[in-house]
């Protein structure tokens, strides 16, 4: 079996080429060690075809095969699909509780601000002014103080309501913006899918890759990381190299919300109410709205696709969107609780006011103390009746009784023990023996207890979110470290590999030098 005179040179050259390519891969790893989404690469080495060729139809069986060197079969991404999914799931959960904890902390600061302008302080001062009036029922300054404290109480609650409405509006806008971000990411994934499919189609089965879509897959992986911070995404790998992405972990609908199907992406928007028919929220391309509602709603896409879509945000259980949606729910709940509180307070104070007698009057008062109104968002605002004067305050339960303070005491009792739904007039002696008059017929809570209860509920929810945040952050850090141990670039490891291939290159160059020397000797032997 004869071989080429330059056979050894070709083998040595293959080693030089391989070492250069491997060094280029290492250089690229080092250069991108801090690039977001970059996955460490490694040169996969493969023995070159031997000489003579392996037996086949067109190649005779010959013995004594010689190796023809080495080649780089492909540049491989070092990644783990399991660790990637685990980390993205944990990132989604972590971002949810981080966002929710921030929102609940902000609500707590608004509602339970520890200052002289807090809700509790304003409520205590209001009923404290009635206590002062009960000791001097004929005092005009004491009566004016009651009106002033009532105005302060209303202004304090209005300030809190305004801040909560601002937060409500901001969270709604944030969720809408984040959905638009999700839409943009979905479009990017669909575009990258198309490019990856195109490259994979260029590669013939069983042959070295014409081109590896490593960079595109890195970009797509980074987009998935960004999406997982916004929502709890699920994705599957398709045979052509593309991925399909959805929100939720369900395998059927309802159960998830499709975002990307190979090269097709779906657009999500928000709606304030359920649509009356499918055509009002779904187009033939599958664009769907995501409504904030507790009841699921599904239907069939127009255009004959037959695909059912659930538009309920309850399936968005992770990511910043879930944290903001739950924060919005909590804000709405606090506003509803404040509406109930202020409505009950206004009703009871007005009931006491109109069942008593104004200063020097022989008939019960017809002037309400409070005239509740609503904001543009239909939340209750507590305002003192502009027609109310100091003389109009009904501090007495009887007419023409000098120093009668029983109605003022009734108002004080309201602060600590509540009042019935039906207006009842009590005198001082009856109040002494009845210390548990409820706010309404359905509850025994006092106004003080009612407000404290709201704040306590908020505190419990905030503490739970903070606890979940700590747990989720710890799991996220752990999964991120595991993922980085596989996909991240270790500079020390790269430096060691660089020296290894440098030595290999030197050895190959030395081998070529020896072969060259042998050839020179042979040539010099020719006469």
Mark where each language-model region is.
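Structural signature of extracellular appendage/secretion-system components
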Residues: 1-527
């Amino acid at each position: 079996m004869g071989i080429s005179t330059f056979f050894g040179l070709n083998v040595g050259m293959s080693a030089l080429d391989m070492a250069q390519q491997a060094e280029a891969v290492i250089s690229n790893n080092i250069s991108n060690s801090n690039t977001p989404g970059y996955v460490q690469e490694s040169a996969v080495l493969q023995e070159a075809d031997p000489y003579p060729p392996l037996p086949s139809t067109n190649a005779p069986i010959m013995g004594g095969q010689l190796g023809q060197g080495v080649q780089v079969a492909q540049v491989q991404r070092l990644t783990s699909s399991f660790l990637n999914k685990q980390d993205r799931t944990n990132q989604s959960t972590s971002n949810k509780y981080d966002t929710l904890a921030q929102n609940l902390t902000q609500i707590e600061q608004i509602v339970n601000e520890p200052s002289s302008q807090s809700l509790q302080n304003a409520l205590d001062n209001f009923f404290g002014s009635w206590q002062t009036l009960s000791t001097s029922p004929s005092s005009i300054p004491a009566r004016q103080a009651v009106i002033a404290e009532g105005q302060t109480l209303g202004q304090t609650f209005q300030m809190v309501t305004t801040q909560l409405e601002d937060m409500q509006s901001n969270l709604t806008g944030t969720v809408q913006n984040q959905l638009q971000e999700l839409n943009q990411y979905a479009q990017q994934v669909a575009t990258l899918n198309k490019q990856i499919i195109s490259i994979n189609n260029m590669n013939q089965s069983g042959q070295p890759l014409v081109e590896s879509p490593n960079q595109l897959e890195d970009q797509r992986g980074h987009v998935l990381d960004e999406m997982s911070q916004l929502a709890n995404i699920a994705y599957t790998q398709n045979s052509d190299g593309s991925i399909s992405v959805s929100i939720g972990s369900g395998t059927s609908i309802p159960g998830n919300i499709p975002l990307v199907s190979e090269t097709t992406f779906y657009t999500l928007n928000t709606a304030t109410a359920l649509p009356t028919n499918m055509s009002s929220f779904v187009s033939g391309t599958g664009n769907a709205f995501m409504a904030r509602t507790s009841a699921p709603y599904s239907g069939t896409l127009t255009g004959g696709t037959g695909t059912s879509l659930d538009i309920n945000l309850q399936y968005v259980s992770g990511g910043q969107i879930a944290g903001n949606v739950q924060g919005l729910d909590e804000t709405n709940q606090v506003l509803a609780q404040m509406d109930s509180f202020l409505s009950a307070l206004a009703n009871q104070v007005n009931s006491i006011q109109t069942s008593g007698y104004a200063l020097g009057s022989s008939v019960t008062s017809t002037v309400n103390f409070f005239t509740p109104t609503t904001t543009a968002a239909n939340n209750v605002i507590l305002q003192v009746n502009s027609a109310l004067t100091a003389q109009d305050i009904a501090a007495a339960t009887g007419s023409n009784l000098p120093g009668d303070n029983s109605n003022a005491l009734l108002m004080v009792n309201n602060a600590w023990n509540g009042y019935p739904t039906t207006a009842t007039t009590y005198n001082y002696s009856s109040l002494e023996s009845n210390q548990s008059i409820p706010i309404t017929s359905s509850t025994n809570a006092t106004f003080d207890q009612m407000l404290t209860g709201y704040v306590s509920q908020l505190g419990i929810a905030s503490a739970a979110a903070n606890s979940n945040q700590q747990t989720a952050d710890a799991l996220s850090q752990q999964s991120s470290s595991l993922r980085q141990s596989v996909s991240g670039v270790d500079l020390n490891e790269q430096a060691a590999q660089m020296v290894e291939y440098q030595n290999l290159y030197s050895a190959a160059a030395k081998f070529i030098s020896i072969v060259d020397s042998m050839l020179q000797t042979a040539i010099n032997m020719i006469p």
